[in-house]
Amino acid sequence: MHGRLKVKTSEEQAEAKRLEREQKLKLYQSATQAVFQKREAGELDESVLELTSQILGANPDFATLWNCRREVLQQLETQKSPEELAALVKAELGFLESCLRVNPKSYGTWHHRCWLLSRLPEPNWARELELCARFLEADERNFHCWDYRRFVAAQAAVAPAEELAFTDSLITRNFSNYSSWHYRSCLLPQLHPQPDSGPQGRLPENVLLRELELVQNAFFTDPNDQSAWFYHRWLLGRAEPHDVLCCLHVSREEACLSVCFSRPLIVGSKMGTLLLTVDEAPLSVEWRTPDGRNRPSHVWLCDLPAASLNDHLPQHTFRVIWTGSDTQKECVLLKGHQECWCRDSATDEQLFRCELSVEKSTVLQSELESCKELQELEPENKWCLLTIILLMRALDPLLYEKETLEYFSTLKAVDPMRAAYLDDLRSKFLVENSVLKMEYADVRVLHLAHKDLTVLCHLEQLLLVTHLDLSHNRLRALPPALAALRCLEVLQASDNVLENLDGVANLPRLRELLLCNNRLQQSAALQTLASCPRLVFLNLQGNSLCQEEGIRERLAEMLPSVSSILT
């Protein structure tokens, strides 16, 4: 044993580490206590900077101590000469950088650096950009550093083109850089603003095509990396329409005018207001939502005075102007007619996608073919499958309808954890297709039965629909947006899994409601139907509530205007 170095046992090592931790904790607590005592006594001097440096150098996430340092620095600003302050700031910046090396994702450290640079008369922004580049090279997904870089770029008025070039360099080095792709999505609309396109408006076509080529190179290089797929989806969504007034309807019998927007809005807010003229004369009216609540809505209504519906005159011309986007609709109510309307011509480009130029269509078609080839090589790549579906939607939703449904089945098998999301997305696309077919047929009846729907959408497009068939689906609820169907007379919703009827309210023309074989368990679920004044027929057969004792009497009392209730 002589001549050998004694090795500590595991118990001795554990005890040594315990004593070391206790010693560090004592120093930490004593330094913290000293800082708080000085702060309470108003002794905001350089000794506080020294004490907080000891603690923050090891644990940069002590927010209160950063506050103490700011208080001290503000105090010293009034006491130091410009030369002394410059030296102090230089030391503070160096200390902050050392803290960032300890924890590059420290909220307090990055915030303190922002605060410090904001107080300098002539900050060295070039140095800060270089600092960001170094930390992003170490961790390209450090969102704290990305936030700080955006702050620096804004303060230094760095041109968006320069920042875009910076993302180019990072993406070229590594395609799997979600933050760089995201930053591009922020910079491109700044670089290429399009008049009258809104915050979600389109990019110039040459830019869009260039970006599509770039991102295609990325996801073909690494098909399993999600960054490029997300960016590709963002590019496909770069053509959302701005706010428009898409439909105007006038009912003589109800003395009511209805308008429908492309998205939910509040009339009379900073977004804009509605101006109504009848026979070229301005008419002051009160606008309201179908449920009377002042919240964003696709549909807004107003009551019409009797004079504006005088049937002795040959016609009345109604014009509504939306000041938010300077769009208008006009319709003419003829003598002897009970209603009139005006709506946009409903092609698929105008309803659910933007019209494609020949060049863009060719590029997307090429991408679709390439993605199909990639899918053959990577049959379980969910991003590739989803992108194929989205490309088909962008190109021609009706032409690819059957093929799209087949890809949905494959995608659900590949990604069962997102089955509910995929069911809802599939339902959205099926509703869109059915609306398109209805519009092309120029009818007011919409058949959505036997489509395995899990959600309803685009109800704002159905203001003129009189008959809606939702039977034999998997709908758990009918959304409040159903109130947009101002002309609906017959609603078939049998053989679903409806648990309540909260969305079936304020439908002025609803006469027949079929709800067989759902999951309605209590009569209270039908209370909202009292807001449908013309409802005369209600079929509830096959629901649990039909087993309630005295259900018919309770329903007759709740819904006195309904003459026929089947239980």
Swiss-Prot record:
Coiled coil: none
Disulfide bonds listed in the record: none
PFTA-type repeats, residues: 44-78, 88-122, 124-158, 159-193, 207-241, 363-397
Annotated control of activity: The enzymatic reaction requires the aid of a Rab escort protein (also called component A), such as CHM.
Record SUPFAM superfamilies: Outer arm dynein light chain 1, Protein prenylyltransferase, Rab geranylgeranyltransferase alpha-subunit, insert domain
Phosphoserine modification, residue list: S98
InterPro entries noted in UniProt: LRR_dom_sf, Prenyl_trans_a, RabGGT_asu_insert-dom_sf, RabGGT_asu_insert-domain
Pfam families on file: PPTA, RabGGT_insert
Keywords linked to the UniProt accession: Leucine-rich repeat, Phosphoprotein, Prenyltransferase, Repeat, Transferase
GO cellular component terms, A-Z: Rab-protein geranylgeranyltransferase complex
Protein's UniProt keywords contain Transferase: yes
LRR repeat start-end pairs: 442-463, 464-486, 487-508, 509-530, 534-555
GO MF entries: Rab geranylgeranyltransferase activity; small GTPase binding; zinc ion binding
Catalytic activity, as annotated: geranylgeranyl diphosphate + L-cysteinyl-[protein] = S-geranylgeranyl-L-cysteinyl-[protein] + diphosphate
Organism domain of life: Eukaryota
Entry EC number(s): 2.5.1.60
Role summary: Catalyzes the transfer of a geranylgeranyl moiety from geranylgeranyl diphosphate to both cysteines of Rab proteins with the C-terminal sequence -XXCC, -XCXC and -CCXX, such as RAB1A, RAB3A, RAB5A and RAB7A.
Family membership: Belongs to the protein prenyltransferase subunit alpha family.
Connected disease: Defects in Rabggta are the cause of the gunmetal (gm) phenotype. Mice homozygous for gm have prolonged bleeding, thrombocytopenia and reduced platelet alpha- and delta-granule contents.
Subunit structure: Heterotrimer composed of RABGGTA, RABGGTB and CHM; within this trimer, RABGGTA and RABGGTB form the catalytic component B, while CHM (component A) mediates peptide substrate binding. The Rab GGTase dimer (RGGT) interacts with CHM (component A) prior to Rab protein binding; the association is stabilized by geranylgeranyl pyrophosphate (GGpp). The CHM:RGGT:Rab complex is destabilized by GGpp. Interacts with non-phosphorylated form of RAB8A; phosphorylation of RAB8A at 'Thr-72' disrupts this interaction.
Protein name: Geranylgeranyl transferase type-2 subunit alpha
Organism, as annotated: Mus musculus (Mouse)
